[in-house]
C-alpha cells in the first residue's frame, strides 16, 4: 500500500514558519533598511530563483550568515518572506506599488502576477497612464497591455486628467499614435495634443513632433481652416505648415491623397 497525506506539506510549512518566528534553525538573516529578517535558505530558494541562485551558486552570499538586500522596503521583504512560508500575502492599494517591485527583483513570480492582476482591476481614467508606466518599468507586460487598452478606450476621459498632462514626450507620442484611440473625431486628438503642448512653455518646441501624430486629414475642412490654419504656433512652423497643407489637399484632391487617408484613418470609431 502506498500512503499519501496531502496534509503533510501544509503541516511542514506551518512548523517551519513557527521555527522561523522563534528564530530556530534559521541559517540566513536578511538585512534590509537596518532591520534583520531571519529565514531558512531552503524555503527561500524553493520559492525564488533569485535566492536559489544566491544560495547555490558561487556568490559570496552563499556562505554569509547575514545577507544585505538593497532597493527593497523592509515591509515588502517581510511580506514576501511570510508568503514563502504561508502562501498568503495581503495586497492593497497602500502596499502594491512597493510589493510588486520587490517581488519582481526577488523573483516571486506568483506574487508579481497577483499584484499585476490587482492593479488591472483598479484601472480607471485617473490612474491608467501611471499604471502603464509602472508596468513598463517592472516588466509586467500583461498589465501594460491592459492599461494601454483602457487608456485608448476611455481617451475622452483620460485626456482631461492630470496624468495626461504629465506624460513625457515619448509617452504622449506613443499615446497619440495609437490606432485604437476611441474618439468621436480626430479633432479631439488635436485638442488634446494642444493642451499637452501648452501645459508647459518649453513644450512648444516639440510642436511638429506631436502634431505629426495627429491625423489632420481626418479633421473637417472647417476645423482645419479655423483651428489649425489660424493657430500661430502652427503657421510659424514650416514643418507643421507642410502637415496642414497636406491635410487641406486631402480635402481638395481626395483622389490624389488616398494613401494618406487610408494609412491614417483606422482609429475612428
Outline where the language-model segments fall.
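Alpha-helical scaffold in the C-terminal half of BTB/POZ domains
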Residues: 2-6, 10, 37-39, 44-49, ...
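Short linear motifs in intrinsically disordered
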Residues: 12-22, 56, 123, 267-268
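Conserved AAA+ ATPase "SRH/arginine-finger" region at the nucleotide-binding site
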Residues: 68-72
Amino acid at each position: 500500500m502506498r500512503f499519501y497525506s496531502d496534509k503533510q506539506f501544509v503541516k511542514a510549512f506551518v512548523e517551519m514558519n513557527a521555527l522561523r518566528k522563534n528564530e530556530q534553525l534559521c541559517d540566513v538573516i536578511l538585512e534590509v533598511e537596518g532591520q534583520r529578517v531571519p529565514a531558512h535558505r531552503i524555503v527561500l530558494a524553493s520559492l525564488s530563483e533569485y535566492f536559489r541562485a544566491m544560495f547555490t551558486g558561487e556568490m559570496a552570499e552563499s556562505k554569509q550568515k547575514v545577507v544585505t538586500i538593497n532597493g527593497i522596503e523592509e515591509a515588502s521583504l517581510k511580506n514576501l518572506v511570510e508568503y514563502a512560508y504561508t502562501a498568503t500575502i495581503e495586497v492593497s492599494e497602500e502596499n502594491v506599488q512597493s510589493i510588486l517591485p520587490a517581488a519582481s527583483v526577488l523573483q516571486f513570480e506568483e506574487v508579481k502576477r497577483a499584484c499585476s492582476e490587482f492593479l488591472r482591476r483598479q484601472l480607471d481614467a485617473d490612474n491608467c497612464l501611471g499604471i502603464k508606466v509602472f508596468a513598463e518599468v517592472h516588466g509586467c507586460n500583461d498589465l501594460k497591455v491592459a492599461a494601454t487598452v483602457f487608456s485608448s478606450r476611455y481617451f475622452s476621459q483620460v485626456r482631461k486628467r492630470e496624468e495626461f498632462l504629465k506624460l513625457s514626450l515619448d509617452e504622449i507620442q506613443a499615446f497619440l499614435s495609437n490606432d485604437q484611440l476611441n474618439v468621436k473625431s480626430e479633432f479631439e486628438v488635436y485638442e488634446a495634443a494642444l493642451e499637452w503642448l501648452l501645459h508647459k512653455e518649453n513644450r512648444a518646441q516639440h510642436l511638429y513632433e506631436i502634431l505629426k501624430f495627429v491625423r489632420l486629414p481626418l479633421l473637417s475642412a472647417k476645423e482645419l481652416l479655423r483651428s489649425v490654419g489660424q493657430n500661430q504656433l502652427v503657421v510659424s512652423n514650416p514643418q507643421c505648415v507642410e502637415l496642414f497643407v497636406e491635410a487641406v489637399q486631402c480635402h481638395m484632391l481626395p483622389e490624389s491623397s488616398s494613401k494618406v487617408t487610408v494609412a491614417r484613418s483606422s482609429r475612428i470609431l
